[in-house]
Amino acid sequence: MYEYFEGTITVVNPAYVVIEVAGIGYRILTPTPYAYKEGDKARIYVEQVVRENGMTLYGFKSQQDKVLFNKLNEVSGIGPKSALAIMAAEDNGALASAIESGEVSYLTRFPGIGKKTASQIVLDLRGKMGNYVAENLFTEDEPVESVFPALEDALLALGALGYSQKEVDRIKPKLKKLPEMSADEYIKQGLGFLLKK
């Protein structure tokens, strides 16, 4: 069983990345492929799912994201692909908070999640997200190598424009999902997100 891969990102695709470790390329499905950049060194925490038709690797930027994926995957009616789609749609801190507070309507916003499945998620996982919410484990505090330098500059600039750290942290996961761009473009996108309150 693999715990994580550490190597060089060689392919970034809308659905997956390829990480090369000791001359072998591993294709890993991830909710945030554009958080990685070709040529970057990275550590990806992986979950191996074996089915009759083969083996699939699912990868995450942190151990906590991997734990959340496994919890979602254990819910009746949620498979690995649905769990991945849920984690790609919003930041995981907000997701954990919604589960803890029983916000079924929030959960139905995710692809393929109806009211029945959303209720099942709350039923199965409510009371198990407290540590994630309380300790704020999903703040995307990952190594700098996984974040575009221009994005870091843009986040600092937004803070200098008068936005609070909380506001900047709220939009950071959304900006990280975008393809790499200039700091000016990140600032424009960030302002757009901030004004959509």
Curated annotation (Swiss-Prot):
Residue ranges of region Domain II?
62-140
Q: GO molecular function, one example?
A: ATP binding
Q: Which GO terms describe its cellular component?
A: cytoplasm; Holliday junction helicase complex; Holliday junction resolvase complex
CDD domains recorded for this chain? UBA_RuvA_C
Gene3D superfamilies to which the protein is assigned, alphabetical: 5' to 3' exonuclease, C-terminal subdomain, DNA helicase RuvA subunit, C-terminal domain, Nucleic acid-binding proteins
GO biological process entries: DNA recombination; DNA repair
Which coarse location class applies to the principal site listed for this UniProt protein?
Answer: cytoplasm
Residues annotated as region Domain I? 1-61
SUPFAM superfamilies listed in its UniProt record: DNA helicase RuvA subunit, C-terminal domain (SSF46929), Nucleic acid-binding proteins (SSF50249), RuvA domain 2-like (SSF47781)
Keywords noted in UniProt? Cytoplasm, DNA damage, DNA recombination, DNA repair, DNA-binding
Q: Where is this region: Domain III?
A: 150-197
Q: Which residue ranges are recorded for the region named Flexible linker?
A: 141-150
Subcellular location per UniProt equals:
Cytoplasm
A Pfam family name for this chain? HHH_5
Matching InterPro entries: DNA_helicase_Holl-junc_RuvA_I, Hlx-hairpin-Hlx_DNA-bd_motif, NA-bd_OB-fold, RuvA, RuvA_2-like, RuvA_C, RuvA_C_sf
The protein's job, in short, is: The RuvA-RuvB-RuvC complex processes Holliday junction (HJ) DNA during genetic recombination and DNA repair, while the RuvA-RuvB complex plays an important role in the rescue of blocked DNA replication forks via replication fork reversal (RFR). RuvA specifically binds to HJ cruciform DNA, conferring on it an open structure. The RuvB hexamer acts as an ATP-dependent pump, pulling dsDNA into and through the RuvAB complex. HJ branch migration allows RuvC to scan DNA until it finds its consensus sequence, where it cleaves and resolves the cruciform DNA.
Q: Which NCBIfam families match?
A: ruvA
What information about domains appears in the record's comments? Has three domains with a flexible linker between the domains II and III and assumes an 'L' shape. Domain III is highly mobile and contacts RuvB.
Query: Can you tell me which family this protein belongs to?
Result: Belongs to the RuvA family.
Self-association state and partner proteins as the record states = Homotetramer. Forms an RuvA(8)-RuvB(12)-Holliday junction (HJ) complex. HJ DNA is sandwiched between 2 RuvA tetramers; dsDNA enters through RuvA and exits via RuvB. An RuvB hexamer assembles on each DNA strand where it exits the tetramer. Each RuvB hexamer is contacted by two RuvA subunits (via domain III) on 2 adjacent RuvB subunits; this complex drives branch migration. In the full resolvosome a probable DNA-RuvA(4)-RuvB(12)-RuvC(2) complex forms which resolves the HJ.
Q: Give the protein's recorded name.
A: Holliday junction branch migration complex subunit RuvA
What species does this protein belong to?
Answer: Lactobacillus delbrueckii subsp. bulgaricus (strain ATCC BAA-365 / Lb-18)
